Amino acid sequence: MSEHFEKRRPVFLQLGFNEAALPQLKAYLDLLWSSNEELNLISRKMTYEELIDNHVIDCLLPIKDFPKDVKVAADFGSGGGLPGVIYAIQFPNVEYHLFEKSKLKQDFLNRCVSIAPNLRIHGEIPPKLEKIEVVTSRAFKPVDVILEFSRDYYKKGGKYFLLKGRKEKIDEEVALARKKFKDLKVTVQPLSSPVLEVERHLVLI
């Protein structure tokens, strides 16, 4: 496992990951991998190499575009911590609130606090998000549902940093969201993986 992590080290750095935080990233991935058989945090059929190439690098693709000077962030549907834990490791000065309704996954995320002490773990997304400056998510819900979950935050000018896949699907989601949120302003940025031929986009609201 360590071999593939070291093999991808240049890619992590190329994408903008903090070299000093690589030991924490490795510790998180080892914990995620060792816990997966019991908790099913990611597909049990997935190899460690696929975990890095399909998930970790996926999360890092837009990391250079993460809003500057953010002090408090939230991640919706955090699951096994992709991207929430990775971003908390990358940005240790950001108080990162992870929202995950599964009790088992919450328990796992609480174990990650020893690796990234700036993490705060919660269950359901509350009606009002206090002090949050940006919301992240990956492979969670459609755009309109994410906005519905955080309607009060959105109305107050909240920012969203959403990792999505196919452009066609994104266009459908945005069209539906615009029916509910007439003033919705969206920017869709293509992302290019250096290790896989996959269609990825960053949705900024």
Curated annotation (Swiss-Prot):
Q: Which organism is it from?
A: Bdellovibrio bacteriovorus (strain ATCC 15356 / DSM 50701 / NCIMB 9529 / HD100)
| UniProt xrefs under Pfam families | GidB
Q: What is its EC number?
A: 2.1.1.170
Record-linked InterPro entries: rRNA_ssu_MeTfrase_G, SAM-dependent_MTases_sf
- A molecular function GO annotation: rRNA (guanine-N7-)-methyltransferase activity
Q: Which family does it belong to?
A: Belongs to the methyltransferase superfamily. RNA methyltransferase RsmG family.
Q: Does the keyword Transferase apply?
A: yes
Q: Which residues bind S-adenosyl-L-methionine?
A: G77, L82, E100, K101, S102, L129, E130, R138
Q: Span of the secretion signal?
A: none
Can you say what this protein is called? Ribosomal RNA small subunit methyltransferase G 1
Physiological role: Specifically methylates the N7 position of guanine in position 527 of 16S rRNA.
Q: Which PANTHER family match?
A: S-ADENOSYL-L-METHIONINE-DEPENDENT METHYLTRANSFERASES SUPERFAMILY PROTEIN
The encoding gene: rsmG1
Any single Gene Ontology cellular-component annotation: cytosol
Q: Which UniProt keywords apply?
A: Cytoplasm, Methyltransferase, rRNA processing, S-adenosyl-L-methionine, Transferase
The transmembrane segments are: none
Q: Where in the cell is it found?
A: Cytoplasm
